[in-house]
Structure formats: C-alpha cells, structure tokens
C-alpha cells in the first residue's frame, strides 16, 4: 500500500511517543487512587474538537467509573497507533482509518474501534481574504496548504473536492509537506499559499489576527463522517472488558453533557484543558462545533459510517481491499453505555 511506511513501523517496532505532561485524574468523594484502575489514553491531538472527552475528564466521570486516566497526546494518528500497538497506551483516540491500515499491514492483534466520538470533520478552509460568496470552484488553480497524505483531514478535503467535480491532483496545488499543527504558521509566513485547511483554535486565531478568514466548514460540506473514534487491541478488549465498558460509560456521560448544555457551559467546563485559550475564543470555537452537529448523541460506530469511511479511503487511493465491519468495529460497549 502506498505511503503506509509509518504503519509498518508501528507494527514492527516500539517508539517513544511525545506526550503532553501526563494528567492523572483523581477520584471524588474521598475515594483513594489505589482503588482506581490505571488506564492510559493516547489522543491524536489535544483539540476543542473533542470537547465531550474533556467534559468527562473535568467532571470526574472517569473516576466515577473507577478509572485513573492518564492522557497523552500523540500528535498524529501514526504515533497514536504506534503507542497502542506497542502497549504504551491502552486505548487510542484517532481516525478509524489507522486501524484499517494496520489491519491490512498484517497486524496479528488487530486494533478494534469500540466508540465513535465525532461525526463530522473538525477543520475549516481559511482564505487570505473575506469571500462571502465562496464556492469550491474558487480553489481551481490555487495553492492550498493541506494535510498528510492518507490522513483523515486530507482525505475528507479531497472527498469534498471530488464531490464538486474538482480533481485534487490537477485542478489545484495541495501542499502536503507541512507537519500537522504548523500549517497556520506556514500560511502566515508563505504568501504563495491562497488557502489553508485548519483545525481550531488555529482557524479562529488566524481570523482574530486578521491574517485569514474561514470560508467553508469541511465538516458541513462533507456531511456526516466517522472522523475520530476510540480503539484498542483485540487482546486488550478481550482481557479487560470491564475497563473498556467503564471507559465508554464515562465518555457517554460526557456526550450526554454536551447534548444538554449550552456552548458557554461546555466551554467553562473544559477551560482547564486549554489554559492558553481565553474564554471568549474558547466559547466561539465550541459554538462553531456545536452548531454544525459535530458530536454524536451516542458512541455507537454504525456500519454505514464504516462503509462511508472506506469509500473515502478508496476515492483517495488509500485502500487496497475493503475490510469487513465486524473485523474492526464492536458496538457492544457503546450500546451498553446508552442504557
């Protein structure tokens, strides 16, 4: 498979994953940490896009479920998958395409998705100038700072382009050479780029600095897409079903919270996770995701969503052979968490 060297390395070797300072969440109501089960979660990025997860952390839902959670940021699905395969992390949070790549590379202990958090893409198309009448045809013959080849941000972007009869290879120039998290700085410094595809808070930051303007939401224009999900090795799922169930229960509580509270309330709760983001900006970003129906009501990863994901991979030329839904998805824990 083209451009899958990273996942081959993930299957073959153990790498050290760069982490944010480890965050341990203590129990409430006088419960000692010794009574909690330690679990390490490696997230693909630390983003407001994943608000329900941070609500679950800040509201103490993991501790309520008997878990002492350590959160690590992998800074990329390749690194997050490596951490899961190597055993550095018990659970990974990333695009489900990574589990498909690993499976097709011959993983002997497949990484299975057990909960889906987001149902839309979380990035935005940013232009240098305001474009109130923007259409996707405006990208023709332009230069865009995109994402890593084979990653969900780039594939969803290309999926939208194809849906608008735009050939990503010939109708525009997409720069895929810039590391995740560095595109906003590159856009500011490289005036040859006409557009950039950005997650929050970079999109809002560019707007507030007057250096860019959001002209389209990839989440809205791509439709409902299984963008990010939680996964673990088959062996871990089989040996630790109660840990996975408790973890999923805590997440469902976070999902319930965001469905029943305002963006202002959500922003207030998750603010300790983003100390460098002021409350006004945080609220603006949460509201942007809230209004486009980013988060599911439950964590069930439906078959139709998995098939759509594979359609996107196929259209991007990143899928050698389709994988059966039952091989890489289980809904047992998410369905139980609903009740």
Show the residue positions of the predicted features.
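Predominant activation on well-ordered alpha-helical scaffold segments within soluble catalytic domains
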Residues: 54, 100, 158, 204, ...
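Short, low-complexity disordered leader/linker segments with a strong preference
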Residues: 1-38, 336-339
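Short, glycine-/small- and polar/acidic-enriched structural segments
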Residues: 30-169, 173-179, 186, 194-200, ...
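Pocket-lining segment of extracytoplasmic ligand-binding domains
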Residues: 129, 181-274
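Soluble non-cytosolic domains of exported or imported proteins
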Residues: 47, 74-78, 93, 151-152, ...
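Secondary-structure end/capping motifs
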Residues: 238-320
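Conserved C-terminal helix/tail region of periplasmic/extracytoplasmic solute-binding proteins
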Residues: 309-339
């Amino acid at each position: 498979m083209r451009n899958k060297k990273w996942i081959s390395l993930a299957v073959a070797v153990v790498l050290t994953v760069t982490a944010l300072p480890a965050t341990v969440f203590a129990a409430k109501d006088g419960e000692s940490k010794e009574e909690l089960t330690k679990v390490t979660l490696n997230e693909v990025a630390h983003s407001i896009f994943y608000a329900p997860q941070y609500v679950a952390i800040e509201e103490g839902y993991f501790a309520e479920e008997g878990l002492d959670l350590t959160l690590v940021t992998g800074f990329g699905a390749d690194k997050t998958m490596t951490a899961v395969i190597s055993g550095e992390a018990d659970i990974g949070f990333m695009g489900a395409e990574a589990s498909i790549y690993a499976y097709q590379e011959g993983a002997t202990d497949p990484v299975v998705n057990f909960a889906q958090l987001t149902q839309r893409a979380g990035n935005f198309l940013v232009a240098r100038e305001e474009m109130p009448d923007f259409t996707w045809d405006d990208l023709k013959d332009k230069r865009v700072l995109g994402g890593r080849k084979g990653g969900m941000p780039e594939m969803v972007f290309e999926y939208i382009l194809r849906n608008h009869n735009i050939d990503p290879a010939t109708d525009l120039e997409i720069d895929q050479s810039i590391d995740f998290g560095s595109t906003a700085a590159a856009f500011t410094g490289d005036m040859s780029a006409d557009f950039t595809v950005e997650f929050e808070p970079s999109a809002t930051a560019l707007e507030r600095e007057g250096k860019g303007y959001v002209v389209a939401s990839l989440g809205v224009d791509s439709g409902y897409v299984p963008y990010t999900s939680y996964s673990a090795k088959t062996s871990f799922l089989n040996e630790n079903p109660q840990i996975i169930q408790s973890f999923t229960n805590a997440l469902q509580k976070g999902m319930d919270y965001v469905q029943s509270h305002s963006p202002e309330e959500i922003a207030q709760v998750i603010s300790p996770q983003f100390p460098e983001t002021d409350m006004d900006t945080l609220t603006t970003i949460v509201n942007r995701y809230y209004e486009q129906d980013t988060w599911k009501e439950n964590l069930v990863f439906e078959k139709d969503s998995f098939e759509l994901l594979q359609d996107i991979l196929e259209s991007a030329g990143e899928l050698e052979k389709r994988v059966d839904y039952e091989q890489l998805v289980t809904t047992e824990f998410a369905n139980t968490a609903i009740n």
